[in-house]
Amino acid sequence: MAQTLYDKLWNSHVVHTEEDGTALLYIDRQLLHEVTSPQAFEGLKLAQRPVWRISANLAVSDHNVPTTDRSHGIADPVSKLQVDTLDANCDAYGITQFKMNDVRQGIVHIIGPEQGATLPGMTIVCGDSHTSTHGAFGALAHGIGTSEVEHVLATQTLLQKKSKNMLVKVEGQLPRGCTAKDIVLAIIGQIGTAGGTGYAIEFGGSTIRALTMEGRMTVCNMAIEAGARAGMVAVDDTTVEYLKGRPFVPTGAEWDQAVEYWKTFRSDEGAQFDRVVELDAAQIVPQVTWGTSPEMVTSIDGRVPDPEREKDPVKRDAMERALAYMALAPNTPIEAIKVDKIFIGSCTNARIEDIRAAAYVVKKLNRRVAPNVRLAMVVPGSGLVKAQAEREGLDKVFTEAGFEWREPGCSMCLAMNADRLEPGERCASTSNRNFEGRQGQGGRTHLVSPAMAAAAAIEGHFVDIRRLG
């Protein structure tokens, strides 16, 4: 019987299935960070349980680490306690960890693939909703809660119910100026933030196949914003080429065996999906969110929508509340929206490809950050991304134009560290969530691609980067 990619991943990891369909899944890799792991380790200690498979875990601090000078440590006592606790727990249990001043430190969903700890055919979990990122490698990856983190540490298994299968098929050539971020925002705009609820999404089609691994990770990263717990892309030569030579990847004869196995992780011809969504890549234009949910998105050449034109009273009410929070008037051209801060970073868009795309725009415009922009910051996703960008001279491109070049971490994606918006500040952000208060109490977030964020920094408002050539 023909199987989908998700079917293959699921079936190859089922240990036991109950009569109600609940399955015990074996977990190949658990990624840990400082926010959702302390209680899990405490539970192990209280029960006097060991970590079942130490080598299956990889840890890093990312949410609370400062992105400015780290020579004096972490100023905030709560953040410091969380980071110190992860350090102590990993030392106690012998878990591999990249500590704050290790060059390999970075955002957990960037360092996993970067190190080759994310591999095709794996089940991967982390106490973080954007674990779906790793599905770009033909893996089944999703976020879990703190009690589940403890369960995986203790048993290397997880109780789950199988999702339905959805295929999101994007065909055609992506227009100039459009990126993977625009693809996934367009998908969410079409199906809504509940469109993928109850499904595991496979992203396919010629447009997805043409993306780099960085681009595929961006798309899978935001599967959760489409309502799905997991997103994934079939394994191909692009996947294999990215992984070759990375630290955690098999070598020699084992590499050849692994590649042969990995390439089986694709949907079979004739495999049945419960839902299929199709997009024409040629119709995608640079996207900008205007509201307080990722589904509240439109094109750069569009206008802020008018709630009066929405017939559904529930949707109309949500639009009105979003516009009030965002301090936007209906029918305002998107290009007329001015910004106060720029954030280029996050597990969605802080890889070397993203940094290069933003730097290209800055060089092309050949001007400094606009006077009305109070802060424009670039936060690489890992120490290795930062080092690569500096070897290419990209840090100088940014700093000479008035951007701040920071240390790696989650940074302004969420108001959990020193990088945050003040009440009323408007930010062009390459992150994944634009909820009320996400980047700071009263902060207003517009989700865009790295190129769009860089252009907004220079112009002081959103602009259509397709005009840059």
UniProtKB/Swiss-Prot annotation:
Reaction(s) this enzyme catalyzes, per UniProt: (2R,3S)-3-isopropylmalate = (2S)-2-isopropylmalate
The keyword Lyase appears for this protein: yes
InterPro entries according to UniProt: 3-IsopropMal_deHydase_lsu, Acnase/IPM_dHydase_lsu_aba_1/3, Acoase/IPM_deHydtase_lsu_aba, Aconitase_4Fe-4S_BS, Aconitase_4Fe-4S_dom, IPM_dehydratase_rel_enz, IPMI_cat
Positions contributing to [4Fe-4S] cluster binding: C347, C410, C413
UniProt-listed Enzyme Commission number(s): 4.2.1.33
Subunit-level organization: Heterodimer of LeuC and LeuD.
Protein name from the UniProt record: 3-isopropylmalate dehydratase large subunit
CC cofactor: [4Fe-4S] cluster
